[in-house]
């Protein structure tokens, strides 16, 4: 298996993923759990991907240091369930040039609706709560074929996945990077 699999072991993320899998809390509480989980998982997924620049601004009286995200970089978070849009709303305030894209599984061919030009600075994050290999395969194939996206520009994030799903993906995509909180042995 040639996949780059990162098992997210941060205690807060593990706790939130467990709560979202097993809780029967109110809608408002679950919504808050999903928001927090989404923010933390996206953080873990892109922290090594994001490039920053340190700028020093000198005036006659003082010197300020600013840290900015590379302005050439842009991101698209692709997800398959409208209920998960709340997971990513807060990230839009933190990460510049972020697009959210809902692709419903009913229309597997709507990956052609992406409206971005393929460039090496564009990064695509596919998010599934529970990994769906059919959806992921169709989406990645469409991105590669229709938009000339390179596999290194794509990362996959899910709360849980099965070993057989990872094996299926490894047979198709060398070096796909996957972040997950739980791998279920099947």
Region locations from a protein language model:
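PRPP-associated nucleotide enzymes
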Residues: 1-186
